[in-house]
Amino acid sequence: MKTFFLKKLTIILYLISSSVSYSIERPEIKNLIIHKDKKKIENIEFTKSEAQKVSLNNFKQNPLIINFWATWCAPCKKEMPSLDRLKALNDFKNFNIIPINIGGDSYEKSKKFFDEFKIENLEIFTGSGPEFSQLFKIRGLPTTILIDRNGFEVGRIVGYIDFNDQSLLDWLLKNL
């Protein structure tokens, strides 16, 4: 009798807790880490195209999405086409989306990757893997840093994400 009562009580508590957790509003976006306190981003230089040096200061005033990737990274191969489609969306035309290859690949190898995966809306950027890894505390690829209009990191995505996920799109528009 006690066992039956305990099983019934467990089921009731489970059902109540499940309904409560669904009623709390929070983003359910896999791999998104939202910072409680915004972090000021330091200016750093990297290379655009084959040889043009640029810095994060070149991209002020608009939301900034920095995606760190490499040609040899399997999740990056899956993620990059959705990042490219994100840049093509009208709501994101004013966003600066910067994919920086920090895998030690040359511009030519990055260009070949972009051609192979039909990446048409993004530019090619390259940077020093160790320097960026240390500055941004990157522990794996892909890693995406989300920076608001004021130059503060408000969150990051660690690992693969589908940039066409509607809940992510809504969060980006609201918070960057």
Show where each model-derived region lies.
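N-proximal helix/coil linker or "cap" segments that precede and/or mark the start of modular domains
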Residues: 21-43
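Hydrophobic beta-strand anchors of alpha/beta hydrolase catalytic cores
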Residues: 65-66, 97, 144
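Bacterial N-terminal signal peptides that target proteins for export
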Residues: 1-9
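Short active-site neighborhood of thiol/selenol oxidoreductases, capturing the structured segment around
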Residues: 55-77
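Thiol/disulfide oxidoreductase modules built on the thioredoxin-like
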Residues: 116-120, 127-173
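Bacterial N-terminal signal peptides
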Residues: 8-18
